[in-house]
Amino acid sequence: MDNVERLMEFGLTRHEASLYILLTLEGSLNGYEAAKQSGISRSNAYNALAGLVDKGAAYIQEEDTVRYTPVAIEEFCSNKIRHLEQKKTELIAELPGKRKNEGGYLTIKGEEHICDKIIDMLLCAEERAYISVYNERLEMFREHLEKMVSEGKKVVIITNEPFDLQGATVYLTECKKEQIRLITDSKDVLTGAITNRYEATSLYSSNNNLVEVFKDALANEIQPVSYTHLTLPTKL
């Protein structure tokens, strides 16, 4: 993901994001200069500059000609996040709660969405989490696993190489690089494969039978890390 795409995540169009980056490099520009330097047509450039002003990403600087100057990136992003947090609070308060998934099977596609679901499961876990994942991918979940440990929750990691996480139990086994499996609180399970950013699919469920199947599967693949002298768990 490049900086244009990152800015688009904050609600800017591609033209707006491109001109915002140009403004941060140049300091301030008028519409003609912005169009000329960006290669965007003059009409599209003026529309994009007006959009930046409307979205809180640029200010108008009144001189002989109207010029545009960028809002600092930290200020712009923080403002967006603050407004979104406020809207999130309002939506949670006003919209009805989601009915719990009663044992259905949900397909989640895309690496980002799968990782988001894993993080949500870790955040919502009340007692324990068992995660089986390739060592290279574990790092993106470290913060949330550490939080669980700090709260006194049980964390068991099954991976292919030693992973240093104080307070967690680590087991080594032959993990497939693309495979991810997670069980939280013996109630929810996620299993899937991430081959690349876009070709990734996982299955999420709270179906008791599926949870039991994967609990048995994880128990069977666990091998204690030699340097910790751990004992095999009898129950996940």
Which stretches of residues belong to each language-model region?
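Short, Lys/Arg-enriched N-terminal segment that forms or immediately precedes the first helix
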Residues: 1-9
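Conserved small/polar residues in nucleotide/adenosyl-binding loops
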Residues: 228-234
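A short, conserved structural fragment
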Residues: 53-61
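Short amphipathic alpha-helical interface segments
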Residues: 17-27
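HKD (HxKxxxxD) catalytic microenvironment of the phospholipase D
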Residues: 169-218
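Short, cationic-aromatic polyanion-contact patches
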Residues: 8-14, 30, 62-82
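PLD-like (HKD) phosphodiesterase/transphosphatidyltransferase domain
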Residues: 74-147, 156
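A short acidic, leucine-rich amphipathic alpha-helix
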Residues: 33-36
